[in-house]
Amino acid sequence: MENKSQKKVSDLKLITLWIIVIFGYLLFVVEWFVIDRISGKPTGILTQSTTTLPQYSGWLSSFFTENAGQIATSSTNWTITLLRAVGSILCGVVVLKFGYRYAVLIMMGIMCVCFPFLIIGDPLNGHNQLTLLRPLSDSVKTQLSSLSSNLQVGQLLGPVMINGKTMLADGTSVELIKGLDGNSIGTAASITGYALFIIFRSTIAIGGTTLVVYTQPAIANLSSNRKKSILSNANLWGFNIGIAVVFTPFLFEQVQQVASQYWVYIMTVMILVVFANLCLFLWFESKIDHIFPQKQTKENMSLTTQPKSIDILKNKTTWKLIGVYGIVLILIVNPLTPAWFSILQTVSPSGSNGLISTGVYTTGLATLAIFWVIGYALGFVVFSPFNKTIYDKKRWMHFLLTANIVVLLIIIMFAATLGIGSAAGFALISIFSFIGGAFAWSLSSSNLILPYEFKDYKKNELPILFGFCWGFGYIAYTLFDITQSVFLQAPVLIQGKGTSILPGVIVSIVFFLGLIALANLIVKFFPACWIKDGDQLVQEMTRKWKLNEWQFVIANKQKNRYSELLK
C-alpha cells in the first residue's frame, strides 16, 4: 500500500502553505499587541470636588479604578504566557493525534473562540454587571455638584465617592478591593469580569503561538537547505511585521485615543480576518497531499517510524536547545515591554526621564519597540546569510550573544548619562535599539535553524521539537517576568510608596545580562552541525568561522569565489 505522506509536494505549494500559516501567526501578533495598545486607562473615582469629566475608553475602564501595581499587572502576563507554553508543548501532541491539517484548523479555531472577551469587556450601555460603568442616576448627578452642569442622566460614568461612601453611577453601593500597593482597584464583580476577559483573551495566544511551530513541517519538506534557511529566517518577520504594524499608528496620540474608544469594533474586524484565513487554509490545504506529520493510525504507523515525544525529551540536546531558546526569547521580548522602558526611565538622570511630546507625536516605548523589531531588516541582510554556510555555528552564536550584551550595556549607559527624556539620549538609545535588534533577531533565526542541522533529529520530529522549544521557552520567559516584576516592585513593598525602585532596577539589569551570558556557556556544549539531504547525513560542518570572515554576506549560488561557503 502506498504511503500518502511520502508523496512529493512541490516547493511552490509548500511556500504558499507557509505564507497562509505565517499570516495566521502575524494576525495573532497584531491582535495581541493591539489589545494592549487600546487598553485605555482605569476609571478613577469621581467625588463631589471633581471638576474634570474623565474620558472612558479602552477595556481597562471596564474593570479597574486604579492601576493594580507592577506585580498584579505582570501576573496577567504570567498567566497568559504559561497558557501559551501549555499550548506550544501540546501542539506536537495535537498534530500527531489529528494530523497536520486538523491541528492547524484547531489552533486557528481556538483563536476565533476568543470573541466572548468583547462582550465581557464592553459596558453594554451600562447593563454589563461585570464592569464598573453604569448609567448615571438623577440622585447621584445632583450630588456631583462640581460636574452636574456637564452631566446628563443616563450617561455612562465610573464609580463615585460621596460623603465617604463608594457607589456605582446608578447609585448601587459597592466595596472596592485593594491591590498590593494599597490602591482601591475595583469591585469583586469587575475583578471577576477581568479574570474572564483574560481567560478568553488567552485563546488568541494559545492558538496563535502554535502557528509559528506549524510552519516547520512546510519548511522541513522543502527541497533544499538553502530554501529552508531562507524561510526559517523569514519566520521571524511574522512577529516583527506584526509589531511594526501595531506600534507605528500608535506613535500618534489621536490614533491612540480613537482606537481606544472603538476597541470593540477593531477587535471584531481582526477576529473576522482570522476566520477568513482559517477558511483559506482549509481550502488550500485540501488541494495538496498531506505532509508530515500525519494523524497516527495503525496503517501509517506500520509504514513509517512515528516520532515519540518522550524520546525527544530524553535527548540532552533537546534541553540545551530549550535552554538557549528560552533565554533568546527573553532577549528579544523584554525590550518590547513596559518594564524595560521603566528601567531606562529609572536609570535616567532626574529631569531627563520623561517623555518628549510635540502634541502629535510622543516618544516612548512604541518608538523603541519599532526600532528594535525593524533592526531585523539589518540582521536579515548582514547576519542571517551566515545560516546558509558550511561554517560551524558555535563561534557565530558566541559572537551574537556577546554583541547583544555589549549593545544592551551601551543602551543603558546612554540612558544613565544623557537620559531617555533628552532628545540626544532618546535618539542614541533608538539607534542602538535598532542595532541591538539586528543582533538579537539574527541570533533567534540562527538558533531556529540548528535543529535542521543536528544529526539527533529527523524532519518529522521537528514540529514536536519546536513545540517543546516554544513551550518551555515561554515557561522560562514567565519565570523571568515574575522575577523581574518582583525585583522592580520589592523596594516599594518593603519601604512603602514613594520609594525609588533603582535598587530593583540594578538587580534586574544584572539578572537580564547574566542570563544572556549563561546562554553563551550552554552554546559551548552544542553538538556539531551537519549538511543533510533530508534525514541523511552528508557532511559534518567542521570549518571554523573567524571574526574577519564576512564573505558569506555576498556569497551566492552562482559560481563565484565565495560559493564554496554555501551549503
From Swiss-Prot:
SUPFAM superfamilies: MFS general substrate transporter
One GO cellular component, as annotated: plasma membrane
InterPro entries per record: MFS_Mycoplasma, MFS_trans_sf
Compartment(s) where it occurs, according to its Swiss-Prot or TrEMBL record: Cell membrane
Entry's transmembrane regions: 15-35, 78-98, 104-124, 193-213, 230-250, 264-284, 321-341, 363-383, 405-425, 426-446, 462-482, 503-523
Sorted UniProt keywords: Cell membrane, Membrane, Transmembrane, Transmembrane helix, Transport
Membrane-topology annotation of the record: Multi-pass membrane protein
Keyword Cell membrane: yes
Recorded phenotype for the gene knockout or disruption: Not essential, it can be deleted.
Family per similarity comment: Belongs to the major facilitator superfamily.
Protein name: Major facilitator superfamily transporter MG061
